[in-house]
């Protein structure tokens, strides 16, 4: 499995197709009631049938993830002579906040004569107001 989810929860990666369904019939019915959904009696009957909670014929192995990517980047940087500081593999905030944080780290080391690499992986978000242009990476860089 290649994970694009922080922390690699297998049931969340690609909506968890290789995992047992952890939701319950009761939860499904609560959603129907909460949103006052109109469903057929046949659908209502199907929602009363529990799904298997274990899968015995599958093994999930995360082969690639943000954590693995950060490790590989660290190895590559060290091979090239950089002094590496691993910050996080769970960056999870507004892109603007991440940019401010990373810029402060870079500025505090701008006079260093060493070759430095600061590594951070994760996922940033941008909340757009009005007509925005660009995306998370551009927002972080600006």
Residues covered by each model-derived region:
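Active-site histidine-anchored catalytic micro-motif
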Residues: 1-29, 33-39, 111-121, 126-142
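Accessory alpha-helical/coil subdomains and C-terminal extensions
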Residues: 14, 20-101, 108
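Short, hydrophobic/amphipathic alpha-helical packing segments
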Residues: 99-103, 141-142
């Amino acid at each position: 499995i290649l994970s694009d989810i922080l922390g690699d929860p297998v049931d969340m990666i690609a909506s968890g197709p290789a995992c047992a369904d952890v939701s319950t019939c009761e939860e499904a019915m609560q959603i129907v009631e909460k949103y006052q959904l109109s469903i057929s009696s046949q659908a209502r009957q199907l929602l009363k049938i529990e799904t298997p909670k274990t899968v015995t014929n599958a093994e999930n192995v995360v082969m690639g993830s943000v954590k693995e990517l950060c490790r590989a980047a660290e190895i590559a940087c060290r091979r090239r002579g950089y002094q590496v500081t691993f910050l996080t593999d769970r960056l999870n905030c507004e892109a603007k906040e991440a940019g401010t944080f990373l810029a402060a780290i870079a500025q505090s080391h701008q006079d260093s004569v060493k070759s430095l690499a600061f590594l951070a992986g994760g996922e940033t978000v941008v909340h757009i107001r009005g007509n925005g242009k660009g995306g998370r990476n551009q927002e972080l860089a600006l």
